[in-house]
A protein has these predicted regions:
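N-terminal non-catalytic structural scaffold regions of very large proteins
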Residues: 1-268
Length: 269
């Protein structure tokens, strides 16, 4: 696999024009999200990540994450004069002037034709869960919504995400200015080898999630039919077992990975 949580740069061709791209595979607790910052044909920065159809304007997304002023956004990217020139063009194209308007811009992209309250909640949920999820480790584990300090913790994580996006934008501009080369995806420094422990961790997580969904389905079906709820009938033993044994036997692991090329004979001699 490509290294997680590491900024990588590359070129792409679109409509016979070169697009400069900085991307990162952000991974946290088994969830892996591709976040891309690119400089489009109009020389404007755009961001894409899971759950968002299309692209979001970079500056407006930064405002949604808590950087309200243009000065703060520029500081998060770079103080270099050449990069500042590029950033001025992005600032002029921005349509948001506050954190609230930035969140509503994201919400309208995610849930068009919905109520403002729903759009705001949806935008905050996506920003907190799908944008750069590896930075969510900064959030205290036992802190819940409504607890003292929860709002401050959420805001600090969003600011961390904004500054990480700033680093990605700087990498993109450095590529434009020939200050850095594109990253070699085949170089060993950009690769990570998943061994048995990592594969088993991913496999067990997915298998357990499937088991819990199956238990929920069995209990809901029994409840609808007014039957007595029984753990023996709700928990099917083969769901977890078969899900674990099949990849071990065939080598077809989760995520399309392949390993062992033949069936293993499990005879204990």
């Amino acid at each position: 696999d490509l290294a997680s949580n590491k900024i990588m740069t590359e070129f792409t061709e679109r409509y016979n024009e070169r697009i400069y791209v900085a991307k990162v595979f952000s991974q946290f607790r088994g969830y892996r999200a591709l976040v891309v910052v690119e400089r489009n044909r109009k020389n404007l920065l755009e961001v894409s990540f899971p759950s968002v159809a299309g692209h979001l304007r970079f500056v407006d997304l930064m405002k949604a994450l808590g950087l309200a002023s243009d000065h703060d956004i520029v500081e998060a990217v770079s103080t270099d004069e050449e990069i500042l020139t590029f950033m001025m063009q992005n600032l002029e194209e921005s349509e948001c002037d506050s954190v609230e308007s930035g969140i509503m811009y994201v919400g309208k992209k995610l849930a068009p034709n919905q109520t403002r309250d729903y759009q705001k909640k949806r935008a905050e949920f996506v920003l907190d869960n799908y944008l750069l999820p590896h930075l969510n480790y900064l959030m205290p584990a036992n802190l819940k919504e409504g607890d003292p300090g929860y709002r401050a913790a959420v805001d600090s994580v969003r600011l961390a995400k904004a500054h990480f996006l700033g680093r990605m934008a700087e990498s993109c501009f450095d590529l434009v200015l020939n200050r850095r080369r594109i990253d070699d995806k085949d170089h060993y420094a950009n690769k990570r080898l998943k061994l048995a422990g990592d594969l088993m961790e991913d496999l067990f997580r997915i298998s357990l999630n499937r088991l819990t969904r199956d238990i929920k389905y069995q209990l809901e079906r029994a409840s609808m039919r007014h039957r007595d709820l029984s753990i023996a009938t709700a928990v099917r033993a083969d769901v977890l077992t078969e899900r674990l044994l099949h990849p071990l036997a065939t080598g077809n692991w989760v995520g399309g990975r392949t390993g062992v090329s033949q069936l293993l004979d499990r005879v204990d001699h």
